[in-house]
A protein has these predicted regions:
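Conserved acidic, metal-coordinating active-site core of Asp-based
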Residues: 199-209
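Metal-centered catalytic cores of metalloenzymes
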Residues: 1-50, 65, 74
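A metal-dependent hydrolase metal-coordination microenvironment
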Residues: 24, 47-200
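Exposed alpha-helical structural elements
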Residues: 15, 31, 152-155, 204
Length: 209
């Protein structure tokens, strides 16, 4: 009987962990609250010898190979005893509020940022931090307290999204032409793979596969 109860508890935890990656925000929030309420504090306490941390996480709002949402990342950090975590999705701030809230519930100190790529004309002939791409620099913004950008800078995020969508569709057009008759549709095959309509090149690969 004890074994059966333990197995049922494990199955319920596994179900809730899957729900953390639902595209429905309410489902994610309910799942996290349930998991936190059943967590064993002593099993998720950071080690006294070393502080575990990961300050460069990507959620499914840009791309995460395991499909982790911001809430799922925070829960994973709690399970592994992380004291500090940071989210830095590409070109979007969609996961900021959820991540900071989830970290608060999980007892983790969280920070939120954004990662993008810029071209620096002055270094057009030199590699900066993107191997094989002279002039291209991965650029970070850190310390966001909300995903709601002020009106005076909100157009920057809009422009990042526009550029990403144009880049994706150019890639898709070229790959479709090369792989024809194996083709995919941006609206029908790619966008549904994202929770908020911000696909990356990796989503294109997933759609083809």
């Amino acid at each position: 009987m004890v074994k059966d109860n333990a197995q049922k508890a494990e199955e319920e935890m596994a179900k809730l962990e899957l729900e953390l990656n639902s595209f429905d925000p309410a489902t994610r929030a309910d799942a996290l609250d349930s998991l936190i309420s059943h967590a064993q504090p002593e099993s998720t306490r950071p080690s006294a010898e070393a502080v575990a941390l990961n300050m460069h996480c990507h959620s499914f709002f840009s791309f995460n190979a395991f499909g982790h949402s911001p809430s799922s990342l925070a829960w994973l950090g709690k399970k592994r005893g992380f004291a500090l975590m940071g989210i830095v999705d590409f070109d979007v701030l969609d996961g900021v509020d959820e991540f900071l809230s989830a970290c608060g519930k999980a007892g983790i100190r969280g920070t939120a940022g954004i990662e993008t790529r810029v071209f620096v004309p002055e270094y057009a002939a030199q590699e900066i931090n993107s191997p094989g791409e002279p002039g291209v620099c991965y650029h970070m913004g850190i310390g966001f307290s909300s995903g709601r950008a002020p009106e005076n800078v909100a157009p920057i995020l809009t422009d990042l999204g526009r550029r990403a969508a144009e880049r994706n569709q150019q890639i898709l057009s070229r790959v479709n032409a090369y792989l024809d008759p194996v083709t995919i549709d941006y609206e029908g095959d790619v966008l549904p793979l994202t929770p908020a309509g911000h696909p990356t090149e990796r989503h294109l690969v997933a759609a083809y596969i």
